[in-house]
């Protein structure tokens, strides 16, 4: 984060330097409607993990995940459907660059790119995917990211560890004070990673339960920072 000097004109003000705190704004709101408020190229980077009908795959009688622990932990949600063409149009309009997790579900909406990332999840469970395709708008060689998908205190079906987002920010060469967008905030891992990196952040979450849980997670994270 950038350092800023506090006002030292007052004799009662100590002359030390404090780190600038990145902004972090999150809204309980439908992201498609919200994005219409923003100008073209408003965000430096959009890093998104849109829904792809996970609830249907967990609950369908023929689904491979039906009898797994994941199926009992996460229930089907009304919003858990594939994004519309309008969503993708707005996403590309308001952001300069984009990162899309689960890209194989959305290829009809994504332009050709060489900047794919294959996330090796180091996953041993045969009923879960061993890897995930991540689409980026960057003109860079494809990479393999070897990071475990396991996360403590998991409360969202597609929750990703904070260090996965930190890796992606480095791959994208994100700069301090860049403005990050996450349209489907979920567990809030992207928000915490952005805060740690000194990036400004705007996120949207339509589900009140997840909104409240990620808010608590973020505030707990900030409280831990104050202890050191």
Stretches found by the model and what they are:
Residues 1-181, 188-228:
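Class I S-adenosyl-L-methionine-dependent methyltransferase catalytic core
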């Amino acid at each position: 984060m950038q350092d800023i000097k506090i006002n030292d004109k007052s004799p009662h003000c100590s002359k030390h330097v404090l780190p600038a705190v990145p902004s972090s704004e999150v809204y309980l709101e439908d992201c498609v409607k919200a994005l219409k408020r923003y100008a073209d190229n408003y965000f430096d980077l959009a890093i998104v993990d849109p829904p792809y009908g996970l609830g249907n795959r967990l609950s369908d009688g023929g689904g491979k995940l039906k009898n797994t622990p994941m199926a009992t932990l996460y229930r089907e949600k009304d919003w858990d459907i594939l994004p519309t063409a309008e969503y993708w149009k707005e996403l590309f309009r308001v952001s300069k660059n984009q990162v899309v997790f689960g890209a194989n579900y959305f290829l009809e909406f994504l332009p050709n790119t060489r900047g794919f990332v294959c996330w090796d999840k180091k996953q041993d469970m045969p009923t879960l995917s061993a890897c995930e395709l991540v689409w980026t708008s960057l003109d860079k060689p494809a990479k393999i990211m070897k990071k475990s998908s396991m996360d403590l205190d998991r409360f969202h079906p597609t929750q990703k560890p904070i260090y996965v987002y930190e890796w992606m920010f480095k791959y994208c060469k994100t700069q301090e004070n860049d403005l990050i967008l996450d349209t489907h905030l979920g567990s809030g891992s992207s928000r915490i990673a952005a805060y740690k990196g000194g990036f400004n952040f705007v996120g949207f979450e339509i589900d009140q339960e997840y909104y409240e849980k990620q808010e608590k997670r973020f505030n707990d994270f900030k409280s831990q920072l104050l202890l050191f």
